[in-house]
Amino acid sequence: MSKTQKTTVKAKKAKRIPVIELVEAISSKNLKRLLSAEGLDEVTRIQLSLYYRKIFKTTSNPLNNDEVGFIKVKYFHSDKLEDTGRVYAEKGRSLQSFKKAIRAFINNGINLDIDMKNSHPTLITQYCKKNKILCPFLDDYVRRREKRLEDVMVFHKISRDQAKELILRLCYLGSYKIPNDDGTSYKPKKTLEFLEKFKEEAEIIADRIAKKEKELYAKIKDNDDCKNKKAVILSVLAQQLEHSCLMEMYNFFTSKKIRVSTLCFDGMLINGINGNISDLLRECENFVYEQINYKINLEEKPMEHKLKFEVPIFSDYVDSDSDCQIKLFELVGKNKFKFCNGVLWVFDDQTGMFENSNHVVFRYLKRYKEYFNFIISTDDDGNHKTKNYATDEVLRKKIIGFIKDECQDNEWMLKTQTSSLGYLLFKDGIYNFNTSTFTEGFDPNIVFKFRVPWKFPKYDKELIKKAYKLSFGALFDNPKPFITSLACALAGEIKLKKIYFCPGKSNAGKSYLIKMLQYCFGDYIGTINGENISYNSKDSRDEAAKYRWAYLLANTRIVMSSEISMKKSIDGNMIKKFASAGDKIVGRKHCESEISFTPNFTIFCMFNDIPEIEPHDEAVSNRLVYHEFPYVFVKEEELNEKPYNKLKDEDLDSKYQTKDFASGFIHILLDAYKNYLENGLPEFDNEVKEKWTAQTKQIDKVTSIINEYYEVTNNVKDFVPLNEILKFKEQHKDLKTISKNRFNEILVEELKLKEGRSAKLRYWSGLKKRHFGDDINFE
């Protein structure tokens, strides 16, 4: 090697072996909250950031809705005094190193703080006695600690903590100065005699220990960092004894399957305890004494976190997809997410309804964006590099699976399908039919599938009058029963067990009323083909398939049917099924499984004419209510042709398709239901029911048709053979569905015909045939 060459010889520092390595359990949730606190000083922020970086695993704690983080911590002896004294957490990144309030806040009840009470004075006293070193004042302080502390507090008018710190300072040969809370101290004008003698004795004890512990003193003597050598040897000896006790405590707790989380100099943090803590600590004290012949006094020390700054409820950070999901539920509410039968439903608080859309999830993430930062890395200055679950497309998709796992409830649809009955959802809130009150905002516990396409309208009597005149007032002479029926249906009063037949001629206003209802109440109003409730003996579909229409409309409130063929009868069993006060029905979509559901709707059949009902028993009759549309709306030139004609409003479309009409029309029905609650159902016009029931219609048909083709004379000389009348009945399309017995009954009771018999034939007397000149084609 030439002289000009520069060489650098680096002494290899021996790798330090930790005294012990533990896994520290902390509240990861509270740690993240601290990192998000504005009042945190920069030094502590860096310390906590680097500490957070060490978390290698997290688990949830459902008992207190916390998240437990785990950190591996290595403990070493001091660099200044290797292999002796206390052990310190590597780089100070442990609960051991944090201030009491910070430590308690991060601990959050996960660990118990077990403390060796009055550790150093107690251990030094025992050491002195074992080595024949007189220590009467130290022994007196250990035996009568509370009394001596009280004396110091009263004499100097200071707090208990100040008194303890003063005595420990004197124990380690410090000056007689009273400590202040800010770290400064002052010399009192008067001193307590006991403390003066206590200080003198401590100096003697330190001198004796230095002579006895020669090897230890030699290390300290040669260490330039140790200024007061005698004080240091006293302290280090106490720390050695303390550490020995600490290790035996560790051995005891681990033998009991109790986890030691953190070493804290004169104690430790432990968790996983079952049983009585007091009994456990007494047993541990005995174990330590048996092992090293030193007595200790253990106590559970309360951990209080009176922080001097405000900590936010939610932190700015999440550390996993699962953590993101948990925080989303905390911010938004778990009840806003339901994974039911393979479908994720998310409550949209902008509409008041559950939606099958991940975009609602993403919208919630964006709303609370500041809380979903994911730390990718942290530099040595504690600065974080982050991504955000609200803006990162890859991250936000990852939480969907965790949401599904945590909110699965395959009974949710079934349990909530009638939860909205008695309520009506508007664009800005919920109307309660039972209290006649509107509340702004939405409730995920009331599951709506539809909503009114309007904000809840203000109550305006003039608008109500105008809407009434344009709708019900124009359609009916006495609309109150019909309005009440619609109001009850809209409120979900399925317990009334009614189906409404609403017959009327063409252009009677039935279609317009349906349009008005749909315009004002949106999807709460459903429509069906009248054939859906007709009887079809050739229909081979299973029942669930037949009721597909009902399943699709299950959450509507009012179902309006269109015209129905008179060639088919109405299914009486279906009437009973759909007016059953909430009995469940089985339905399904095409190629899907059967689902049990409760129809929330009431059916209104808007027919021109009403077919026969089969079967038509008393249960069917009790469920049927009849409301007739009595008028026909025509042009002006046709107005006088019929007594039931009314002038058609050519501008009706533009008049009802307005916000003002909707405001008034909505309150017509809301008021009607309020009146129903106060006064019950109004009386219905029984004449309408009688007019449109099957028996009355049969009478009308038979009498009108017979009178058209025959003349009723009630003259016994006039007669028509029975077989001719029977043939006539069977050939006429409107008579052949009526039974022979019923037909004959009407001839006798209504037309007053009498059956006669001669030697050659049987006949109806009082009747003669009209002559049209040609054969009649009954079809």
Swiss-Prot record:
Its EC number is 3.6.4.-. InterPro entries: Helicase_SF3_DNA-vir (IPR014015), P-loop_NTPase (IPR027417), Viral_Helicase-Primase_Cplx (IPR051620). Keywords: ATP-binding, DNA replication, Hydrolase, Nucleotide-binding. The keyword S-adenosyl-L-methionine does not apply. Residues 477-642 form the SF3 helicase domain. GO terms for molecular function: ATP binding; hydrolase activity. This is Putative helicase V13. It comes from Sputnik virophage. The lineage of its organism: Viruses, Varidnaviria, Bamfordvirae, Preplasmiviricota, Maveriviricetes.
